[in-house]
Amino acid sequence: MITLESLEMLLSIDENELLDDLVVTLMATPQLAFFFEKYPSLKSALLNDLPHWKETLKQRLRTTQVPPELEREFSCYQRSQSIDNQAFQTRLPAIMDTLNNVESPFLTQASQLITSPERTLGQKVTSGLHALFLQRWRLSLTLQTVSLHQQLMNQEREILLDELQQRLTLSGKLEPILAENENAAGRLWDLSAAQRIQTDPRLLLDFGTFLQRQPALQKLAERLGRSRETKSILTQEAPQEAFRVRVREPATVPEQVSGVHQSDDILRLMPTELVTLGISELEYEFYRRLLEHRLLTYRLQGESWREKVTERPVVHQQNEQQPRGPFIVCVDTSGSMGGFNERCAKAFCLALMRIALADNRRCYIMLFSTGVVKYELTSEDGLEQAIRFLSQSFRGGTDMAACLSALLDKMDDALWHDADAVVISDFIAQRLPDEVVNKVKSRQKQLQHRFHAVAMSDHGKPGIMHIFDHIWRFDTGLKSRLMRRWQHGKAY
């Protein structure tokens, strides 16, 4: 079987010119012209796809087989080119039968050429007539091939136009939410190429509208997303300057058993002391030790952190900005993060996705409660994954240690080794294991990894939050929400 591309090559038909005509016709359609006028930032992104479209169409030509009738006629034409006038005259009846059997458009013209009035019956076929016959036959084959090419391209044009309309409609709706600049518009256009976006994108639009009504949350995401760490160059000067350090010390609020000590706390008596109280000979001994605060009791003690100001030599530095890496965002989906906290956390992730698209970065989401669920919002099917993420419900417990362990494992990947880690939570959770804390501190010290905390509550445990480099606070309490709404309304 011969392909359409091979037939065009054998007939010296320029397929590139035909493909260029198709692209020009496609770009001039009123539907695309309307979208380009409404969303000019998407036009340049679409034009970048033109080479890919042409290559796709060429691949279609390579795989499309010509009809058997046309292939049979072309084979007959090729054999007729390599014979002389006498052999051509001998085979002329067979050629006419072939043209008749394949119902060739050239049949009528061929009959007129061989039965012309100037040619007497039985007269030999001259070289001029032979050349004219082959020339007209080649022209007929060329017209048939071009017609077949046009039919195929028209089908592809309709398919491509339908796909472009769907992508432009989706990209146009999401452009105000996700396209901050030309680079973001281009990446949004690439994301719209996913062929299986089955979920309604209205979730993205709803959270985009919610984010616009929370300018403080959007500003916080901008500050976190645009922040850069610096590389320090040391100098020789080292003056004394005040230095603040967080110091851990025992707290008065009991949290856990930390040992045994002597006291008069009846509620925390050890069982051995209660035994002496039940023996009449030792009862007075029990009361004596009670008065002397010498009863063995459990010691319950908590931890708290305070700032301690000291002075130490500080070396002056010159700072060089480091390039921004991707985001790995851990979102707490426990029951305490439901309601308004849930909407704020999802909108914050949407804002980080917008920044990632604008800065050509990647954005990876990890949801944690009693398990860990993962989404990459900037992958090829990022829009579908973003919609699935926004449709998640927040309920369950809080296993922050498992999420941080999964985050650290992800940062071992070469593609994510310079990522910024962001944890969004109310930080009302159990104490982190020392192993996880030590791993985080090791990465901060040795690899300069950055860990950010976005606190959705003022009641988070300091013992958990102290491991983060930066703590970004967004209070979701009723009073703070009313104050932000009042300030937002006053600004307008």
From Swiss-Prot:
Pfam families: VWA_CoxE. It is found in: Cytoplasm. One of its GO terms (cellular component) is cytosol. It comes from the Bacteria. Keywords: Chaperone, Cytoplasm. SUPFAM superfamilies: vWA-like. CDD domains: VWA_YIEM_type. Its main location: cytoplasm. Gene3D superfamilies: von Willebrand factor, type A domain. SMART domains: VWA. HAMAP family: ViaA. Homodimer. Interacts with RavA. PANTHER family: PROTEIN VIAA. Belongs to the ViaA family. Component of the RavA-ViaA chaperone complex, which may act on the membrane to optimize the function of some of the respiratory chains. ViaA stimulates the ATPase activity of RavA. This is Regulatory protein ViaA.
